[in-house]
Amino acid sequence: MDVRKDQSHLTLNQTPEAHVEKSHAPDIIGSWSLRNREQLKKRKAEAQGRQTSQWQLGEQKKRKYQRTGKGNRRGRKRQGNVEQKAESWSQTENERVQEVLVPAEEETEYSGNTATQALPLRASPTKAVPTEHCSEVPQESLQCQEITIQNHSQTHQRRDKAEALSPTTCQEIGVLQYSPKMCQDMAEPEARSPKMCQETAVPQTYSPKAHEDMAEYEALSPKMCRETPVPQYHSSKIPQDMTGPEALAPDMCQETTVSQNHSSKVPQDMAGPEALSLKMCQEPTVLQEHTLKICQDVARPDVLSSKTHQEMTVPKALPCITPGDAAGPEGCSPKTLPQSDVTPMSVTPGKNTSHPDLGTAVAEGCFSEAGECIVSEDISTKTHQEAVEPKFLSHKTYKEFTVPIVSSHKTIQESPGPEEYSPGSRHEMSGPEDLSIKTCKNRDGPKHSLPEGAQEVGGAQRQDPDAQDIEDAGAFSQDLEEGNKADQDPETPAGPQGPQKICPENDVHSSALF
């Protein structure tokens, strides 16, 4: 039993010790919960220390990057670009505001100056012209850049225009707004004569039809170019300036009318000038309708009067015309005869085709020249009375316009007439020898005037030596006839000898015409 008591006592003793141990156990051994709490506290402290250390390290690193300048390069570039843009934007806004304000103030000042002070004449036309037409402002504005500030190219031009608006500098700006050619035209309006104004105004209203007319002058044959020498010698500027009908000189009108007579297309182009009267416009149309074939069929132009026709038919109705009578109408003006001598060139082959009939050829030559003289005289006088003379065409020009065509038609009509007569009848009708001598002299008369007509037509170079040969042949025939006159009686008719001695002269004349 004592053992049990001892064991129980031990147990009792042990229990309080165990209790005591339990109270002091956390300090030595502790429970799991207490241990966990302590560990948690330690962990928290360590975490806080780590955080503080990391924060300190981060700040140190930032300070190093800021000192060395190696960190955040992209960010710095962006910040610099934004700052520069903001500065440039502010500058441009300030400049625009200044530009808007300065021209408004200076325009008010300029308007006040124009109201009080009168600008010179050279500046007045340039002021009214808008600035849209300026073509050389960038080149010319370099002269005025000394006044303006050299910041931007656009502001230079605007400030040049704005700051240079005093009455003296406005002239320079007005001159800069034009090309050099326009400046010359607009610079001195007072110094211009009316002739210069016409020259500048006509090329603007120059029609393409006038160009065609000028092209027709160049396309003429060499013979016609000789008749119209002025368009070749004039410069290209003068025909353009003088194409207006009001400014045509008399010489120019003469040459245009001569060209109408020799070409079929030119009268169509030249028929419509305003300076010609209605009747003058009708005459070229009548001449257009009569072609060369109708002229050969003996067509009569509308220009001739009935009296002219009666006089034209006289050489056919009078078969007994002697060389003396034929010598009468040969007192024509030297200006009309060369023109009629030129036109029968188309008829001369008909004269010289038959050499055996020498008397007939002589008769043809005499009658043709007599008919040509009558035609040239009557037409040159009567057509002046019938037709209305234009303002700018002289009498000489009008003769050149009408005589060559009509006289050629009538010569064609009348030249076949004397062919009906035989050589015997021609010998019987011929008068005494002194009349034939007179005929030779008179026939030599128009031949002396041939070079003058050839100068008008342009063929003087070809016909001058032939005319000298004709004169020598005429003098030789006169000497022969005077020798025969001493042998024969004055009462006997010398008809057969007269025409036979005229034959060599006719041959020389035909060769000259060819």
From Swiss-Prot:
Expressed by bone marrow cells and osteoblasts. Also expressed by ameloblasts in tooth enamel (at protein level). Expressed in enamel organ, ameloblasts, spleen, bone marrow cells and osteoblasts. InterPro entries: Hemogen. The lineage of its organism: Eukaryota, Metazoa, Chordata, Craniata, Vertebrata. Residues 1-96, 408-514 are annotated as: Disordered. Regulates the proliferation and differentiation of hematopoietic cells. Overexpression block the TPA-induced megakaryocytic differentiation in the K562 cell model. May also prevent cell apoptosis through the activation of the nuclear factor-kappa B (NF-kB). Residues 61-79 have a biased composition (Basic residues). It comes from Rattus norvegicus. Keywords: Developmental protein, Differentiation, Nucleus, Phosphoprotein. GO terms for cellular component: nucleoplasm. It comes from the Eukaryota. Residues 441-450 have a biased composition (Basic and acidic residues). The modification Phosphothreonine is found at T322. The modification Phosphoserine is found at S90, S124, S153, S166, S179, S207, S221, S259, S264, S277, S305, S415, S422. This is Hemogen. GO terms for biological process: cell differentiation; regulation of osteoblast differentiation. Residues 7-87 are annotated as: Necessary for nuclear localization. The keyword Nucleus applies. Transmembrane segments: none annotated. It is found in: Nucleus.
